[in-house]
């Protein structure tokens, strides 16, 4: 039985030649189909307002992923909320922190990033203990947060 097609569960890359599957498919004479199998849908503005959370009451946002950044700024745009320049951000990793450049001007004193673990996030929270935090998470999140 010879394999002639491979399904990759990712969106098609913009430059196909830079894909790791390009060289493999050329070498083995295979067809590669790209199809994103996972679709992330953000919470609606109505659902967010039902939680009675005021974004502007918080001084620091904690982001765990790029999708939470997209959802946060989408909700702010839909609710016509202007995020103040004084807002600080704590991100899981440096890659997530750099993704914030899509929405804000990147300044090191406003953006902090952890090493990807819960303990490194706690260190950043303790460092900024006078701030009021808002944690943005995706719904099925890995529960490394302690119950409070």
Task: Name every feature range the model reports, one short phrase each.
Residues 1-148:
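Conserved beta-alpha
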């Amino acid at each position: 039985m010879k394999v002639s097609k491979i399904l990759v569960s990712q969106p098609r890359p913009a430059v196909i030649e830079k894909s790791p599957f390009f060289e493999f498919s050329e070498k083995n004479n295979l067809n590669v189909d790209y199809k994103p199998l996972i679709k992330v849908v953000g919470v609606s503005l109505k659902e967010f307002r039902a939680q009675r959370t005021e974004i502007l009451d918080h001084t620091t946002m904690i982001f765990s992923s790029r999708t939470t950044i997209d959802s946060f700024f989408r909700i702010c745009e839909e609710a016509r909320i202007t995020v103040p320049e004084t807002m600080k951000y704590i991100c899981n990793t440096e890659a997530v922190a750099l993704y914030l450049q899509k929405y804000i001007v990147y300044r090191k004193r406003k953006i902090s990033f952890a090493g990807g673990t819960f303990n490194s996030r706690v260190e950043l929270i303790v460092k900024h203990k006078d701030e009021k935090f808002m944690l943005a998470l995706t719904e099925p999140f890995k529960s490394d947060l302690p119950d409070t």
